[in-house]
Amino acid sequence: MPTSVAIIGAGFSGTLTAIHLARTPATDSSIDIYLIDPRGSFGPGLAYSPPSERFKLNVRAKAMGAFPDDVEGFYRWERERYPNTSPDDFCPRSHYGEYLSDLLNKAVGQAHGHTLHRLTDEVIGIDRNADSGKWAVSLKSGDTITVDGCVIAIGNLMNASTTSAQSTIRFREPFNPKSYDDISKSQTVFILGSGLTAVDTILECEARGFTGTYTILSRHGRFPRPHESLPSSAVAHLPENWNTCGSVRALDEP
């Protein structure tokens, strides 16, 4: 196993990678874990550090545990801090960011001789030495760290058309708290896409007293549908030890 790993990006994926490395049983060598993020926030990332608690998760609390063997972990964490939470609640995204940060802190406290270095910096280059196989990670601060392994966890990047829009002064990043500060209450707000983030954006604008017009452009022209319970009749036809592939095959059978 590598004795040093750089993780670029400290959102959900980067944070969970760091947690799993910190949980690795002790061997002959400990692991130096470098978790690097320019935001200085380790855990929430962009998705779970929205401008207000009006931005909600799109999965119920009881199913948002970070680990597959503990799917109710987040719900227990939430109940300890917010006792009125029910298993079926859609909790604020910011709460999930706090949960991830707590998991990281706990993993570091229980690390098996491994060390986590949290670096508030931006990675500007990665080069691999052909002879040693090690990675040189160049940082905006001017520092360079040399590691045995490198994980790129920079999130879901914007597509080319959205990236080009960022250069205009009217572009707003929906998860940036400052994005809504200078929007006139009577302006027209154009929203590209009609998914859950579009709904979050509208709710945030409404809460800030927006009285203007929303123009929404979407390929399918539909808002998200509400979650529905699976009919008991459908469950009855599933095999006892079902999985996704097996269910698809069963549906294909005449």
What are these regions, as identified by a protein language model?
Residues 1-5:
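Extreme N-terminal starter segment of soluble prokaryotic enzymes
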Residues 7, 11-41, 151-254:
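Rossmann-like dinucleotide-binding core of oxidoreductases
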Residues 117-119, 215:
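General small-molecule cofactor/ligand-binding pocket signal
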Residues 135-139:
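Generic recognition of long tandem-repeat/solenoid scaffolds
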